[in-house]
Amino acid sequence: MATWGRRRAGPGGRERVALAAGECYIVHEIYNGENAQDQFEYELEQALEAQYKYIVIEPTRIGDETARWISVGNCLHKTAVLSGTACLLTPLALPSEYSHYVSLPAGVLSLACSTLYGISWQFDPCCKYQVEYDAYKLSRLPLHTLTSSTPVVLVRKDDMHRKRLHNTIALAALAYCMKKIYELYSV
């Protein structure tokens, strides 16, 4: 864990800045009775809805589940973007008689991933967060008070541009697929 004060290694020799009181919430791993896991989930849900900049999840099980949920959302987003891009760029790279064998499935995959992301993740408060792995950013957090050695740290990020990107690419892929299907079956 990094020390308070001036950072010796890393880009620019930035100084450590203390966080404001309302920027970080810690879900502590304190077992008080049989419903401890439910209490952890409730605390996490409240912290997500309160939109803290950083959320530190100390309980291992709920931290791992949250990190997995976020990584599945990230995978759907990346798959939608990459397959949509492949759908749109394949006709430029392959001969026209073969391009639809790659571009149509890629377009359908992009649309499916974008739709699934929109249905499952769009309204989930967890989609606004990413798991933080950067040691410098983690050193700014009050992790010295934790009892767990492997907490999951979530950082709130604006995902508006991300959603616009994958929705735009998926819609462009849909338009291309509709045009290509019309051309294939109208001839």
From Swiss-Prot:
Bilayer disposition of the protein: Multi-pass membrane protein
> What name does this protein carry?
Transmembrane protein 11-B, mitochondrial
The record, for Pfam families, names: Mito_morph_reg
Classify the main location: mitochondrion
What the protein does comes down to: Plays a role in mitochondrial morphogenesis.
Report the subcellular localization.
Mitochondrion inner membrane
Q: Is the Transmembrane keyword given for this protein? A: yes
Q: Where are the transmembrane segments?
A: 79-95, 102-119
Q: Is the keyword Membrane in the record?
A: yes
Q: Which organism is it from?
A: Xenopus laevis (African clawed frog)
Q: What protein family is recorded? A: Belongs to the TMEM11 family.
| Keyword annotations from UniProtKB, A to Z | Membrane, Mitochondrion, Mitochondrion inner membrane, Transmembrane, Transmembrane helix
Of the GO CC terms on this record, one is: mitochondrial inner membrane
What gene, per UniProt, encodes this protein? tmem11-b
Q: Which GO terms describe its biological process?
A: inner mitochondrial membrane organization; mitochondrion organization
